[in-house]
Regions:
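Charged docking surfaces used in two-component/phosphorelay signaling
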Residues: 16-24
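Short hydrophobic/Thr-rich beta-strand motif most characteristic of the beta2 strand and flanking loop
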Residues: 26-33, 41
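Active-site beta3 strand of CheY-like receiver
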Residues: 45-51
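Receiver (REC) domain active-site loop signature in two-component systems and cognate sites
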Residues: 56
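C-terminal output helix
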Residues: 107-117
């Protein structure tokens, strides 16, 4: 069974590039283009891993992260922040809000895939805890 990923970014080109490559890698991919849509997809599709941009319309990535951690406690799902904001404050805030990994754009596909594989490798350990 393929792992389910949710890619959340308001840049349609980035989303489509990621989706195409991740599907080729064998993942099941759902996409969202803003924070509100992301929360609906988390509830509907129950993804295993979320790739989340910070700067988006409607709800930003921090708001989405907070909502997921407060309201979807039934399942631990790794959240990887993929953001153009490489500022130390954004990185610190992400980790303090329980993001699991942070990648600064521009980021290579190899680094994204490595981050996803690392987070997936932790899922069984988290389920046992």
């Amino acid at each position: 069974m393929a792992y389910k990923l949710l890619v959340v970014d308001d840049d349609k080109e980035i989303v489509e590039t990621l989706k195409t490559r991740l599907i080729k890698e064998g993942y099941e991919v759902t996409v969202a283009y803003d924070g509100e849509e992301a929360l609906l997809k988390v509830q509907k599709d129950n993804p295993d891993v979320i790739l989340l941009d910070l700067m988006m319309p409607k709800l930003n990535g921090f708001e989405v992260l907070k909502h997921i951690r407060e309201n979807f406690k039934d399942k631990w799902r790794p959240i990887i922040i993929v953001s153009a904001s490489g500022e130390l404050d954004a990185v610190k805030k992400s980790y303090s809000m329980e993001a699991d990994h942070y990648l600064s754009k521009p980021v290579t596909m190899e680094n994204i895939l490595r981050g996803i594989r690392t987070m997936i490798s932790l899922i069984p350990a988290r389920k046992e805890a």
